[in-house]
Amino acid sequence: MTDLPDTDFTQRFIFDENDARGELVSLERSYAEVLAKHPYPEPVAQLLGELMAAASLLVGTMKFDGLLILQARSEGPVPMLMIECSSEREIRGLARYEADQIAPDATLSDLMANGVLAITVDPTEGQRYQGIVDLDGETLSDCFTNYFVMSQQVGTKFWLNADGKRARGLLLQQLPADRIKDDDERTDSWRKLTALAGTLTAEELLGLDNETILHRLYHEEAVRLFEEQSLRFNCSCSRERSANALVSLGLEDAQNLVVEHGGNIEIDCQFCNERYLFDAADVAQLFAGAGIDSPSDTRH
């Protein structure tokens, strides 16, 4: 059996004569998995894809074991977007939306009025870190670029696009002074690299392979492209986690829920639509300390 070609990956590159690095991301299968879980309107599907691309690029800039969480909230018809991407490069996402309030040509400001974006790093060991930025740019690309302008000294720019089938992203980031020591020359070099990237159209970013994109933008620069690093969709929900949520309620409340819901408590994962059912016997077993070894009923 022939392996399917990898459609979900990031790929780093570096400029040999400039103090800058970059990364490209392409998502197809994982993007399709996320969109298959809910009937997202096209503008929402595009935002989700762009946020998935951003999360994938951000994980590549961080050295940590744990989880990166991007959560956008607003007062608009898309009150919430959320993407989780682990250091193992597993990604999932979801959105909440009011379909009847979303026009086909809706912009970011239309969809997420008065929005804020929280970027959370939740390491396996150590303290959680969170940064917040207003969603006041014309695009998500602008918002992520603004976040780095406000929160870090290093220059960083994003270009993000998605069309419901493919999500792509490009990141450029300045490196510490090494090849170019003069401040003015460094500034000019960075401006040139970002200006060239700014000529890339959405159609080109979505439709061209990485080698072609880099040649199109930087054929006069010395660029080294590294190996691809795969990503995949994976949901971390489980029956055990759902059971732990029930235990946190306490025995009496859990038993009452069983009665109120006709003999079964149903816990749905909002990310993947997996459903976990617990009956009175399951609840009794949980609080007896035996855990849940086999589901009484689990279904998609």
UniProtKB/Swiss-Prot annotation:
GO terms for cellular component: cytoplasm. Under oxidizing conditions two disulfide bonds are formed involving the reactive cysteines. Under reducing conditions zinc is bound to the reactive cysteines and the protein is inactive. PANTHER family: 33 KDA CHAPERONIN (PTHR30111:SF1). NCBIfam families: PRK00114.1. GO terms for biological process: protein refolding. Keywords: Chaperone, Cytoplasm, Disulfide bond, Redox-active center, Zinc. One of its GO terms (molecular function) is unfolded protein binding. Belongs to the HSP33 family. This is 33 kDa chaperonin. It is found in: Cytoplasm. Its main location: cytoplasm. It comes from Pseudomonas fluorescens (strain SBW25). Disulfide bonds join C235-C237, C269-C272. Pfam families: HSP33.
